Amino acid sequence: MQQPFNYPYPQIFWVDSSATSPWASPGSVFPCPASVPGRPGQRRPPPPPPPPPPPPTLLPSRPLPPLPPPSLKKKRDHNAGLCLLVMFFMVLVALVGLGLGMFQLFHLQKELTELRESASQRHTESSLEKQIGHPNLPSEKKELRKVAHLTGKPNSRSIPLEWEDTYGIALVSGVKYMKGSLVINDTGLYFVYSKVYFRGQYCNNQPLSHKVYTRNSRYPQDLVLMEGKMMNYCTTGQMWARSSYLGAVFNLTSADHLYVNVSELSLVNFEESKTFFGLYKL
């Protein structure tokens, strides 16, 4: 190949190493040198600018794969665990209740057995006492309460006043009643009381007296324990009614006799709730 000599630069041939030429063998073509020497005194032109980089190739965006669904096996295992825990607590509560019930039943059976043994023992002791004739131990005698409450006696027509000691609300215990008097059997402190109910169809304001006496062989005459007097107690010429009540504590001795006197027996109302006489030991 010829080239004109007046061309400032030699021609450059680019040969593809992969191509085959019918004119030359692959080994006879050599690559061009990287630079071509210039002539002396000639300015070398600047090298051509490098080619711009190819634009980046945008790959088509692909959608993200969907999240895998939650495992049904794990959910089932969790539910099964909760069910087992609940069943365990239910069984535990049932066992505790059963244990408490058994304990209460055992305790009740034990108490019942003890009661049966105690009753059997008492029955055996009683049977033995009856068989051998062993008397029971003497129990302490309860001291009788010294008390008396006498009520008015409608047919009383004498002084001292007579009283009812048996019927109605009357009672006598630990003392004696004899001919209108209460007889003391035991020395001590006693509360003595008496009430007399006076009434009349026509008032004349005559003085009324109500007295409680005690009589004892140690004294030459009877002693007045209590006394009540009434004067100007009603309106002249009209119906009237008044009560006289006496009560106090006395130290009485054995064999003392207590009785009641009034100044006007005919004006006394002998109803049991209105006229009475009594005492009790403190």
Curated annotation (Swiss-Prot):
Ranges per topology, Extracellular: 104-282
Swiss-Prot/TrEMBL GO biological process terms: extrinsic apoptotic signaling pathway via death domain receptors; immune response; negative regulation of transcription by RNA polymerase II; positive regulation of canonical NF-kappaB signal transduction; positive regulation of extrinsic apoptotic signaling pathway
A Pfam entry, by short name: TNF
Official protein name in the record: Tumor necrosis factor ligand superfamily member 6
Signal peptide: none
Quaternary structure (record): Homotrimer. Interacts with ARHGAP9, BAIAP2L1, BTK, CACNB3, CACNB4, CRK, DLG2, DNMBP, DOCK4, EPS8L3, FGR, FYB1, FYN, HCK, ITK, ITSN2, KALRN, LYN, MACC1, MIA, MPP4, MYO15A, NCF1, NCK1, NCK2, NCKIPSD, OSTF1, PIK3R1, PSTPIP1, RIMBP3C, SAMSN1, SH3GL3, SH3PXD2B, SH3PXD2A, SH3RF2, SKAP2, SNX33, SNX9, SORBS3, SPTA1, SRC, SRGAP1, SRGAP2, SRGAP3, TEC, TJP3 and YES1.
Induction: By IL-18.
GO molecular function list: cytokine activity; tumor necrosis factor receptor binding
Superkingdom classification of source: Eukaryota
Pro residues compositional bias, start-end: 43-71
Family under the similarity heading: Belongs to the tumor necrosis factor family.
Record-marked site positions (Cleavage): 82-83, 130-131
CDD domains registered for this protein in UniProt: TNF
Gene3D superfamilies documented for this protein: 2.60.120.40
PANTHER family: TUMOR NECROSIS FACTOR FAMILY MEMBER (PTHR11471), TUMOR NECROSIS FACTOR LIGAND SUPERFAMILY MEMBER 6 (PTHR11471:SF33)
Function: Cytokine that binds to TNFRSF6/FAS, a receptor that transduces the apoptotic signal into cells. Involved in cytotoxic T-cell-mediated apoptosis, natural killer cell-mediated apoptosis and in T-cell development. Initiates fratricidal/suicidal activation-induced cell death (AICD) in antigen-activated T-cells contributing to the termination of immune responses. TNFRSF6/FAS-mediated apoptosis also has a role in the induction of peripheral tolerance. Binds to TNFRSF6B/DcR3, a decoy receptor that blocks apoptosis.
Disulfide bonding pattern of the chain: 203-234
InterPro entries: FASL (IPR028326), TNF (IPR006053), TNF_CS (IPR021184), TNF_dom (IPR006052), Tumour_necrosis_fac-like_dom (IPR008983)
Swiss-Prot/TrEMBL keywords: Apoptosis, Cell membrane, Cytokine, Cytoplasmic vesicle, Disulfide bond, Glycoprotein, Lysosome, Membrane, Nucleus, Repressor, Secreted, Signal-anchor, Transcription, Transcription regulation, Transmembrane, Transmembrane helix, Ubl conjugation
Post-translational changes noted in the entry: The soluble form derives from the membrane form by proteolytic processing. The membrane-bound form undergoes two successive intramembrane proteolytic cleavages. The first one is processed by ADAM10 producing an N-terminal fragment, which lacks the receptor-binding extracellular domain. This ADAM10-processed FasL (FasL APL) remnant form is still membrane anchored and further processed by SPPL2A that liberates the FasL intracellular domain (FasL ICD). FasL shedding by ADAM10 is a prerequisite for subsequent intramembrane cleavage by SPPL2A in T-cells.
Stretches that traverse the bilayer: 83-103
